[in-house]
Amino acid sequence: MDFINIEKKWQEFWWKNKSFEPKDDFNLPKKYILSMLPYPSGEIHMGHVRNYTIGDALARYYRLHHYNVLHPMGFDSFGMPAENAAIKHGIHPKTWTYENIENMQKEFEALGFSFSKNREFATSDPDYTKFEQRFFIDLWEKGLIYRKKAMLNWCPNDKTVLANEQVIDGRCWRCDTEVIQKELYQYYLKITNYAEELLKDLEALEDHWPSQVLIMQKNWIGKSSGLQFGFKIADECLKACNGIQEIEVFTTRADTIYGVTYIAIAPEHPLVEHAIKQVSQEVSKMIKAILNTTQRERALEKKGAFLGIYAIHPLTKQKIPVWVANFALANYGSGALMGVPACDERDFEFANLYHIPIKVITQSPQNLPHTKEEVLKNSGEWSDLSSSVAREQIIAYFEKENLGKRVINYRLQDWGVSRQRYWGAPIPMIHCNHCGIVPETQLPVTLPEDIVIDGEGNPLEKHASWKFTQCPKCHKNALRETDTMDTFIQSSWYFLRYTTPKNQRENQAFDQNYLKYFMPVDTYIGGIEHAILHLLYARFFTKALRDLGYLHLDEPFKQLITQGMVLKNGAKMSKSKGNVVSPKEILKKYGADAARLFILFAAPPAKELEWNDSALEGAHRFIKRLYDKANAINPTTSKPEFKEVSLNEAQKLGRKKVYEALKKSHEIFNKAESAYSFNTLIASCMEALNALSAQNNERILCEGYFVLLQILEPIIPHTAWELSERLFKRENFKPIAIDEDALMEDFMTLGLTINGKRRAELKVNINASKEEIIVLAKKELEKYLENASVKKEIYVPNKLVNFVIA
C-alpha cells in the first residue's frame, strides 16, 4: 500500500474540487463544527493533531450524511511570542507570523483536515482588525468600555498587563513568570454588567457542556448574596482619615456580626493612604512591603499591621481596630472585610498570629473556629436563634433602620484589555488635551512596520510619527493610544466571522444571513484550560455584540468537547522534557490515516491520551489489512445489493458485525451521551473486518466494504476515498440504511431458575417452541431436578425458565 501517494492524490483532489466549502443554500440542514483556532507558532504539535482530528471526523461524518457543514480554520496570530521571536532571530513579528501560518497550513493539509479555505483568516489581518476596532468604539460609546488607573497584574518578563483570569497561581499564564502589582491606566470591558446573565445562561448549557467547565465558570463568576453596611470611623480618628467617615464591608454571614473583633482592609484601600502617615515607621514599612508583594505571595502567608484607627460597631457601639491585611483584596467587594475569628478559618489564623481577641458567639465554645452554622449566643436579640434564621432577621433589621442593605456580589471583575506591546490590535482611541479621549474615525488603525523591538517597554511609545497625530474632532495635535488589545478579544468573536465567505466580508464583519443560518456553533472543541478565559470572554462578547445590534443570539456554542492532553511517559509533551513526538515524522513513517486512527482509538476525547508507538503501528497494520483484503473484491459500478437467503454462521456473523458497527457509528456521532467514544466504534470496525476476513462470499464482502468504508471515511478519509472509488465509484457511495434483519439473533440466552434462584443459562434457537425449551431446560438442570418433584413449569418468553419444586 503506497499511503504517501494515495494521501497526496486525494488531498490534491479535495482542494482542486473545493470539496469542503459549504453551500449557499440556507434551506439545507446545517452543522457548524469548530475547533479552537491555534496560535501560529510554526509547527503543529500532537495536541493540535488530536483536537483537529476530532473535529474533522465530525465534519466528514455530517457531510457524508448530507448536512451543509461549515468546518473552518484560522489563526490567532497576534501575541507576545512574535515579539520574542523578533528579538531572538532579528525578524519582524509580521514576517515571522505569516511564514508560520503558511507552514502550518501545509501541515493541516497533509493530515487531510477538511477545512473550508474560503473562510480562513488570521486575526492580525487588517480587515479583521478594522471591525474589531469598530466594535471597541461601539462598546466605548455604549458605556461598556471605560478607562481608569488601577493597581494591575504586571508580568516583568513580557512587560505587559495581565487580566485576573490570566494569572494562574500568581504567575503569568503564558511564560510562568511571577506577577507583580503596578499602577497604570487601563481600558476595561464591563463584563460585570453581564455577570448574572452569564451565570443564568449556564443552565441552558447543562448536558451540552462538560459539567467541570460549567462549575469552573460558575465559581469564577462567584455570585454571593449578603449584607452591605458600614462601620463609622471613631470621632477621634476622623482627622487621620482625611474625611473618610465610614468603612463599607460586605458579608455573606450577617449572623456572625456580633463576633467581629477587627476589620481587615486591603493595602490598596483609600483609607491606608491617609492613615499610614500617623503610624510608626516600622508599620509603614510593613504596609508598603505588602503592597509590593504578588497575589501568590499574599496567599502563601498572612501578614498585616494595625493602622492605628478604630471604627464603631453598628450594633454594639464598641470600638473595632482596623488592620491592613494582605488577604483583603482591593478588587473584591469594597476592599474591606469584617474579621470574625470564632467563625472563620482565615480570620481565626490572623487573630492568633497578631493576638487579636476572639469573641465566641455560638453555643459550642470548644474547637474554634465554628465555620458551620449553629445556634447563636452573645448576639443580642438574635441569641438562641439558628444562624440561618438570625441572618435573615439581621439583614431585615439593617434595611429597616437604614444601616445597610441586602446586595448581590460577584467575584467576577471587569476585564482589563490594555496591553503594553507592539504585536496586537491597536486600541483606536486618541488622547486630546481639548476633547479628552476621542475615538479614531479612520479604521483600521494599523501598526507601523518600521519599528525596533528590543524587549524594553512598548515599541509604539517610541514611534513618534505614529504616536503623534491629530484629534479627529478638533484637528489639534493629539496622542494616539499606544496600548494594544488583549489577544483574547480577537478570539472572542472569530467564530462569527467564519460564517461569511471572504468575498462578502470586505465591508462588514459578517453577513447577517450567513450568521443567522450557521450560528450557533453546533460543536466546539478545545482544551479545558480555556474554561474561564476564552470560553467566558466569548460568551460575554456574544452578548455584548447582541446588545449592540450585531447579533440575535445569546450563546455562541451549543455543545462543547474538551479534549484531554496528549502525554508521553505520563507527562505532557514538551521540548524541555524531551518527550515530544513530531507529527511530521509520524506522517512520513505511517501516514495521516494511521495517525488519525491512533488518535481516535487510543482514548475517548475527554480523557488524556498516552502516546504509544506500538498502538500506532497497530493502527497502520489495520489500514493495510483493510486495503489488502479489498483486493479480493471485484469492482462494481453500482451500490451492492444483498440477495443471499441461505447463509452459514460465518456469513451471518460477517453481516451482523458490519451493521452493528454502522449502528454504533450513528450513536457515536449523534448522541451526546456517547461522549464521542470513537475508540469503541473503531473496535467495532476491527471486529467487523475480522468477521469479513473469515469467509469469502464476494457479495457479503462487497456489501461489508460498502458499509465499513462509510463508517471509516471520517476517521481514515484517504484510504476510504481510495477504496470506495476503486470498488464502487464515489458517485454511488451514498449512506446506506441499517439492515435490521442482519442484526437479528438466531439464538437467545435464557436464565434457568429453580424456585426463583438462578442456576444456569440456556442458549436455544430463537424459533424453538415452549415445549422444546422446557425439555432442554430440564436436561440442563438435571442434577438439580433428579430427586425433586416439579410442581410447576414457568416460561417467560425470551427471558427465563423457572421450575417450582417441592
From Swiss-Prot:
It is an enzyme of class 6 (ligase). InterPro entries: aa-tRNA-synth_I_CS (IPR001412), aa-tRNA-synth_Ia (IPR002300), Leu-tRNA-ligase (IPR002302), Leu_tRNA-synth_edit (IPR025709), Methionyl/Leucyl_tRNA_Synth (IPR015413), Rossmann-like_a/b/a_fold (IPR014729), tRNAsynth_Ia_anticodon-bd (IPR009080), Val/Leu/Ile-tRNA-synth_edit (IPR009008). One of its GO terms (biological process) is leucyl-tRNA aminoacylation. It comes from Helicobacter pylori (strain ATCC 700392 / 26695). Keywords: Aminoacyl-tRNA synthetase, ATP-binding, Cytoplasm, Ligase, Nucleotide-binding, Protein biosynthesis. The gene is leuS. This is Leucine--tRNA ligase. Pfam families: tRNA-synt_1, tRNA-synt_1_2, tRNA-synt_1g. Belongs to the class-I aminoacyl-tRNA synthetase family. It is found in: Cytoplasm. A motif ('KMSKS' region) lies at residues 572-576. ATP binds at residue 575.
